[in-house]
Amino acid sequence: GIDTTDSVFNFIRGQISHKKQIGKVRSSETYRSMLNSFTYFRKGVDLTFDMMDGVLVELYEAWMRKCGLARNSTSFYMRILRTNYKLAVEKGLTPDRHPFRNVYCGIDKTVKRSLPFSEVKRINGLDLSRKPSMDFARDMFMFSFCTRGMSFIDMAYLKKTDLNNGCLTYRRKKTGQLMTIEWTKQMQDIIDKYKPNGTSFLLPIITREDGNERRQYQNQMRKINRILKDIANQAGLPLSLSCLLYTSPSPRDRTRS
């Protein structure tokens, strides 16, 4: 087999170590997650960068889709693999064969209505420290925003075990699609703000596992939607924010931050 420092697996392992050394722990975890996925696809067989061509990369994408990953999730792994490939090209390990030409590396805009980033900033900047229920509603809105517009029902049913290796992986209740999202500091800050609940759920939306989980989710949703209207008023926004827990803000706007 191939066992050189220039092999794809070893090169990415080197990048993981480098990211840890410079303090980019989350980034190193997402690289690790992609490497695990790619190694699994390759059945553990390493390769050199000049063996990577369009056919191989397309097969990897097709394999991920077959495993149930949605387009935004396959694209998330593809972007990491492409970054490593470009770095290998820069280091002279392979000529650029443009193997990513025919695979999807973008972010789908999963939106009907979206909020400009400047307005999200206004919501995030409100001082709600003396209004815990408004603060909580705003945090849930921001969590949805950070996760590219995750719906409230998917947020409510997220499990602690869905968070692994710097990635959040969950199934959409509505479509059954498997989603993978990079876990960020802002998401972690929201979780850290609330004391750990004794349930298997990640967010404190459902707080008791007593058979009434659905009712708890529905009550919380009604309450949060009501409060989001007040938050929109306070931020001087013309539209209700409650619709935005069902539709996602624009990732294109987000990248301007």
Task: Label each PLM-derived region with a short phrase.
Residues 246-257:
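Single conserved hydrophobic/aromatic residue that forms the stacking wall/gate
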Residues 128-132, 169-179, 211-220, 238-242:
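Short, contiguous acidic/charged loop-to-helix segments that flank catalytic cores in large enzymes
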Residues 98-152:
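Basic, Lys/Arg- and aromatic-enriched nucleic-acid-binding interface segment
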Residues 13-26, 35-111, 125-129:
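N-terminal core-binding DNA-recognition domain of tyrosine recombinases/integrases
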Residues 86-94, 144-165:
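Short, charged phosphate-coordinating catalytic segments
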Residues 130-132, 225-248:
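Short, basic (Lys/Arg/His-rich) helix/loop patches that form interaction surfaces
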Residues 175-193, 200-230:
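C-terminal catalytic core of Y-nucleophile DNA break-rejoin enzymes
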Residues 1-6, 17-21:
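N-terminal helical hairpins
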